[in-house]
């Protein structure tokens, strides 16, 4: 019997995402899910757990660790792996470690390329993954807005924005040549507000950094950077202040700006989202390296 129940907006998004996740597992032999520990990763993990419950996830989670993530992110990552019992793969670019790559010394572009992009490509080559789930959304940034749900990559993991396959309705073409792979974005059609509302309704655990609290911050070039450890270079004129801030997006702490906020609960964050007029990625330094920098990074192999 066909159900006549009308799905709510969030339930429609949930159903679409679960369908995509199951479709990839059915089509590909060695999938993996990227786990960056942010809110989008939290939702994607929740959807994957729902898709295969009560069984365990049929694929591992991969975290490319740059060694510059917030300490709270790493603690939360390990805690979730222990709670849910999923297989967690952690990879750090050994060449970057040997060169002592730092966002402070080498700049955001070099750090992101070596520790993130090259680190990711190393992990994908090592484990021979043929499909990689990512938590990118089309409302985040213009290059992601034009990317397909099934995003094809060549043998060097490069993306060609001019060579994308049509996606008609819910039909996805997963055929790839030898050594090619796809990046899959199950939550492409979600917005930032959808993510927060879903987290609230489903009571999904998230990193405490998303909630406002008194935190030590140092303002650099108009961006408030949280002092997360003693590797932060402090100049003679720099002033560290305790301010009520939170993070709308998470990454390497020297490249992620905090925003002034008093939102300490999920309803307050949602209310803030309804009133804000700025992009959630305004605090991501890597997005401002150059014009069209995100698209260039994706063409080089970045997510």
Curated annotation (Swiss-Prot):
GO MF annotations in UniProt: ATP binding; sulfate adenylyltransferase (ATP) activity
UniProt KW Nuclease keyword: no
Top-level taxon: Bacteria
InterPro entries found in the cross-reference section: PAPS_reduct_dom, Rossmann-like_a/b/a_fold, SO4_adenylTrfase_ssu, Sulfate_adenylyltrnsfr_sub2
Transmembrane regions listed in the UniProt entry: none
Enzyme class: transferase
CDD domains: Sulfate_adenylyltransferase_2
Keyword annotations: ATP-binding, Nucleotide-binding, Nucleotidyltransferase, Transferase
Catalysed reactions listed for this entry: sulfate + ATP + H(+) = adenosine 5'-phosphosulfate + diphosphate
Pathway the protein takes part in: Sulfur metabolism; hydrogen sulfide biosynthesis; sulfite from sulfate: step 1/3
This protein's record includes keyword Nucleotidyltransferase: yes
EC number: 2.7.7.4
GO biological process, one term: sulfate assimilation
Pfam families in UniProt: PAPS_reduct
Family note: Belongs to the PAPS reductase family. CysD subfamily.
Listed NCBIfam families: CysD, PRK05253.1, PRK12563.1
Complex and partners: Heterodimer composed of CysD, the smaller subunit, and CysN.
Protein role: With CysN forms the ATP sulfurylase (ATPS) that catalyzes the adenylation of sulfate producing adenosine 5'-phosphosulfate (APS) and diphosphate, the first enzymatic step in sulfur assimilation pathway. APS synthesis involves the formation of a high-energy phosphoric-sulfuric acid anhydride bond driven by GTP hydrolysis by CysN coupled to ATP hydrolysis by CysD.
Name of the protein: Sulfate adenylyltransferase subunit 2
């Amino acid at each position: 019997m066909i159900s006549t129940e009308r799905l709510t907006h969030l339930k429609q998004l949930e159903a679409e995402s679960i369908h995509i996740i199951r479709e990839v597992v059915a089509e590909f032999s060695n999938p993996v899910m990227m786990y960056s520990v942010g809110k989008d990763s939290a939702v994607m993990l929740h959807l994957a757990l729902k898709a295969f419950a009560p069984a365990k996830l049929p694929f591992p989670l991969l975290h490319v660790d740059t060694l510059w993530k917030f300490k709270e992110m790493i603690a939360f990552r390990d805690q979730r792996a222990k709670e849910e019992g999923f297989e967690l793969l952690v990879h750090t670019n050994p060449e970057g470690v040997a060169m002592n790559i730092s966002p402070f010394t080498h700049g955001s572009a070099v750090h992101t390329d070596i520790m993130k992009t090259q680190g990711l490509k190393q992990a994908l080559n090592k484990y021979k993954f043929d499909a990689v789930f990512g938590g990118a959304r089309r409302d985040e940034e213009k290059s992601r807005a034009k990317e397909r749900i099934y995003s094809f990559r060549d043998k060097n993991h490069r993306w060609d924005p001019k060579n994308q396959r049509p996606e008609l309705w819910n039909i996805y073409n997963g055929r790839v040549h030898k050594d090619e792979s796809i990046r899959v974005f199950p939550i492409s059609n979600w917005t930032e507000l959808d993510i927060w509302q879903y987290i609230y309704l489903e009571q999904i655990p998230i990193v405490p950094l998303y909630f406002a609290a008194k935190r030590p911050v140092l303002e650099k070039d108009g961006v408030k950077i949280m002092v997360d450890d003693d590797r932060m270079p402090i100049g003679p004129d720099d002033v560290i202040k305790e301010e009520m801030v939170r993070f709308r997006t998470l990454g390497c702490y020297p490249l992620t700006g905090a925003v002034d906020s008093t939102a300490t609960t999920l309803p307050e964050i949602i209310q803030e989202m309804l009133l804000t007029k700025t992009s959630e990625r305004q605090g991501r330094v890597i997005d401002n390296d150059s014009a069209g920098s995100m698209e260039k990074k994706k063409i080089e192999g970045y997510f």
